[in-house]
Each structure stands twice: as structure tokens, then as C-alpha cells.
Amino acid sequence: MDLTQFNTAGIVWLTVAAIAISYILQSSFLSWYRLRHIPGPFLASISSLWNVLNIVTGRTSPVLEKLPGRYGPLVRTGPNYVLTDDAEILRHVNGVRSTYPRNGWYEGFRVDEYDHMGSHIDTSVHDAIKSKVIGGYNGKDGIDLEGAIGSQVKTLVSEIRRTRGSRPRSRPRWMPARWSRSSP
């Protein structure tokens, strides 16, 4: 067989196709290999096609709910994604000195394009903000939070009784159940 018989454009396209196929196979193998110890559906371990199929068919939520029962508390749902239903794993991942970095998912919590403690991706900035506000969460700041909320609820109830009367109406003016859809 003489190589001069081949068209130069055909050789170029064959080379491009070989490089593309090689790249796809190599990237699929590397993405599978990194999280190979975490069980899950095989198609989910090598590509995002498994997630796309679940989204398109509208069964993402029921499928994801069943995965921990089938594969265990930590399940691989994509080449770079894992799912857990174990609170201890979540505490470990989101812990104070966790080595797991935050990803872009947390940016969705921004309010009017301003970052806050829950939306910062940089762990050091997140920890700095957290150390400033932790006093409000640990209960050692001397504020009787339950008593303060209880007194505000009592004030609200007394104000409602004062302005609307103490007796409830026999029938409300509008009925939200009429506008809702009953399930069979």
C-alpha cells in the first residue's frame, strides 16, 4: 500500500479524530480513576450523561433519593460529584479545619451580588467572618433569646385580639383550598 494514495485532507481528519478520541478516553479514565473508590452508577462515574438523562426524563429527585439505600451513605453521581445522606460526613466536609474546598455552588447564595458568610468560596475569608459572628450562635452572649421571642409573640397575639376581636370568624372571606388542586 502506497501512502501517496491517501488524500492529505483525509490524513489530517483522521489525525484530528484520533486525537479527539484519545482525549475523550483519557479524560473519562482520569475522572473515573480519581473517585473510583466511591460506589455509584457506572455511567455516572465516567460522564455527566447519567445526570442529563435523569434531568430530561424528570426523575432526578426520586432516583437520587434511592441511591444511598442502594450504594451506601456516600454515592458517586457524576465524574466529579458525590451525594451523601449521612450527617457525620457533612459535618466532616463542612467542618472548621476541613481540607475540602468550597466550589461555585456556594456563590448561588449571594444576595444582590454581595458575598456573605454562606457564599464565600475562599475558606480563609469564610472562617474570618464566621469567627466574628459565632458569638450569636453559641448561646454564651447572655441574651435570653427564647424569652425575647416569646414576649414578641405575646405582643403580636394581644395586638391581633385587640384589633380583630377574640372570636374567630365562622367562615373566612376567602378559602385557599378552593384554589388548590386536590390530589386523587
Curated annotation (Swiss-Prot):
GO terms for biological process: alkaloid metabolic process. The keyword Flavoprotein does not apply. Keywords: Alkaloid metabolism, Membrane, Transmembrane, Transmembrane helix. GO terms for cellular component: membrane. Induction: Expression is induced in loline alkaloid-producing cultures as well as in planta. It comes from the Eukaryota. Loline alkaloids show broad-spectrum anti-insect activity, and different lolines may have different biological activities. In vitro tests of NFL, NAL, NML, and semisynthetic loline derivatives with long carbon-chain acylations on the 1-amine have shown that many are effective against both fall armyworm larvae and European corn borer larvae, but the effects seem to differ depending on the modifications. N-Formylloline reduces the weight gain of fall armyworms by deterring feeding, and does not significantly affect corn borers. Residues 163-172 have a biased composition (Basic residues). It is a single-pass membrane protein. It is found in: Membrane. Residues 161-184 are annotated as: Disordered. The chain crosses the membrane at residues 10-30. Disulfide bonds: none annotated. Residues 173-184 have a biased composition (Low complexity). The keyword Transmembrane helix applies. Cytochrome P450 monooxygenase; part of the gene cluster that mediates the biosynthesis of loline alkaloids, potent insecticidal agents composed of a pyrrolizidine ring system and an uncommon ether bridge linking carbons 2 and 7. Lolines are structurally differentiated by the various modifications of the L-amino group and include norloline, loline, N-methylloline, N-acetylloline, N-acetylnorloline, and N-formylloline. Belongs to the cytochrome P450 family. This is Inactive cytochrome P450 monooxygenase lolP2. It comes from Epichloe uncinata. The lineage of its organism: Eukaryota, Fungi, Dikarya, Ascomycota, Pezizomycotina. The gene is lolP2.
